[in-house]
């Protein structure tokens, strides 16, 4: 691998589209960025590029869930002042806060490993295959009988802990949170919506934390300029908005078994490419 390679506009646009398409699907956006970067461009875009472009996809979540977010915030602040107004939305606000704590703690503790070692393609491919089994098991065992009024702080904590698994590229943030929700008996749409709401503070914090690093000179991998990062973030926003809308409609009628099969195929193909020396792991 070369020391530093400047990213072309074609690479920037391609990876931004990949980020937007895969951020909300249970297939791992960070894993796909690592795979696409190395298989097609022979180098890694890096964790900072991933984190900054995630700001675009998370902005898409803000737009898509704007009414829900405003309603929850109003209920939360209202409930702090008037105890008799503490409804399901007030409690949901607390569950998001509780669920955000685990990934913030783990992200700070293992930030160096996240930026380097775990982006190894052996890790990514293995996680794609292994965690597909977890998703399949969640679909098989999930009762899907609980609704938003039945959420508890324990649900927020469990889904929040599950979200920390997404720090490993190849696992998938939506895959881990939706699976946790299904194991807890939540219906599929609620598990997805709660997982997306839970991701907002964590991903924005990660993106803002990595923003200064993205503009500093790098010593290895691919390097994007400021204008390239801006364009990539905007593309990720547009594509991500379309993706989250499609995915939530998809979950109303379909299970995640489709994505289980996809993950296994991609993971096995990458493992074969690694085993034959066609692609470098780092």
Swiss-Prot record:
This is Undecaprenyl-diphosphatase. It comes from Mycobacterium marinum (strain ATCC BAA-535 / M). GO terms for cellular component: plasma membrane. Its main location: membrane. Its EC number is 3.6.1.27. It is a multi-pass membrane protein. InterPro entries: UppP. Belongs to the UppP family.
């Amino acid at each position: 691998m070369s020391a530093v390679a400047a990213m072309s506009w074609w690479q920037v646009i391609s990876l931004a589209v990949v980020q937007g398409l895969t951020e909300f699907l249970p297939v791992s956006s960070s894993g796909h960025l690592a795979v696409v970067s190395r298989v097609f461009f022979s180098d890694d875009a890096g964790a900072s590029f991933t984190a900054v472009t995630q700001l675009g996809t998370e902005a898409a979540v803000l737009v898509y869930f704007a009414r829900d977010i405003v309603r929850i915030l109003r209920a939360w602040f209202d409930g702090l002042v008037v105890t008799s107004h503490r409804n399901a939305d007030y409690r949901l606000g607390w569950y998001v806060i509780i669920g955000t704590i685990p990934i913030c703690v783990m992200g700070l503790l293992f930030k160096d490993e996240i930026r380097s070692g775990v982006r190894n393609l052996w890790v990514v491919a293995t996680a794609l295959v292994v965690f597909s089994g977890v998703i399949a098991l969640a679909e098989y065992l999930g009762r899907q009988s609980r609704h938003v009024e039945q959420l508890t702080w324990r649900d927020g904590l469990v889904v929040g802990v599950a979200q920390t698994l997404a720090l490993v590229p190849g696992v998938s943030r939506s895959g881990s949170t939706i699976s946790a929700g299904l194991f807890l008996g939540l219906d599929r749409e609620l598990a997805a919506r709660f997982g997306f709401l839970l991701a907002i503070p964590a991903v924005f914090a990660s993106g803002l934390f990595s923003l200064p690093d993205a503009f500093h000179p790098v010593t290895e991998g691919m390097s994007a300029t400021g204008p390239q990062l801006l364009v990539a973030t905007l593309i990720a926003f547009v594509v991500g908005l379309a993706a989250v809308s499609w995915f939530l409609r998809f979950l109303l009628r379909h299970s995640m078994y489709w994505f289980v099969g996809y993950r296994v195929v991609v993971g096995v193909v990458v493992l074969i490419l690694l085993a034959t020396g066609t692609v470098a792991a780092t």
